[in-house]
């Protein structure tokens, strides 16, 4: 008989982990919402790579990787970006902590399922770059929403995030920025939904 697993119950708690802990947010965001949005953008970047740039890409795999990209935060919490990326030593140490948390989560699964989930926590270097770009696009969208709500607290974060995306030199992310980002400035009527 298979023992009970807490893997899915623990994943459902992602909604209790707030993002942007050091910022005064007008629009609260949690890790579960962020992971969904990152998955949408990762999928989009994969489709852009395949359909616009004619390169081989498994967009669905990117979406799955993005769904789980912050799962370790259930155990580690959301470490603010300025701390996480303060220097290489700290970044590398935190990567080890995240990896250990991922391993702990996977160990909660029954053996029969574990192998199927391991690939969702293991990305190639190329996949990791695209998921990171999607992660940054999600952060940028949050910054834009905060600015639109009159919250100047996010202006610097918006500039830094734009610069970080540009410095990735990913044609897919550049295409998204050029062809999709402007729509986030529009209201519902301007988006033509009616």
Over which residues does each language-model region extend?
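Alpha-helical, largely C-terminal catalytic domains
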Residues: 1-194
């Amino acid at each position: 008989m298979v023992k009970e697993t807490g893997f899915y119950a623990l994943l459902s708690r992602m909604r209790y982990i707030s993002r942007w802990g050091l910022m005064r947010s007008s629009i609260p965001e949690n890790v579960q919402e962020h992971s969904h949005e990152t998955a949408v953008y990762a999928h989009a970047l994969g489709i852009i790579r395949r359909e616009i740039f004619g390169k081989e890409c498994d967009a669905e795999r990117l979406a799955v990787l993005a769904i789980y990209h912050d799962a370790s935060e259930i155990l580690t919490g959301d470490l603010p970006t300025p701390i996480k990326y303060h220097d290489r030593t700290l970044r590398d140490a935190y990567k080890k902590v995240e990896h250990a948390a991922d391993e702990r989560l996977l160990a909660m699964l029954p053996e029969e399922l574990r192998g199927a989930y391991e690939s969702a926590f293991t990305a190639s270097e190329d996949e990791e770059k695209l998921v990171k770009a999607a992660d940054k696009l999600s952060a940028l969208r949050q910054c834009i929403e905060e600015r639109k709500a009159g919250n100047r607290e996010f202006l610097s974060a918006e500039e830094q995030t734009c610069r970080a995306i540009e410095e990735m030199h990913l044609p897919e992310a550049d295409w998204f920025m050029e062809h999709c980002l402007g729509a986030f400035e529009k209201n519902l009527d301007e988006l033509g939904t009616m």
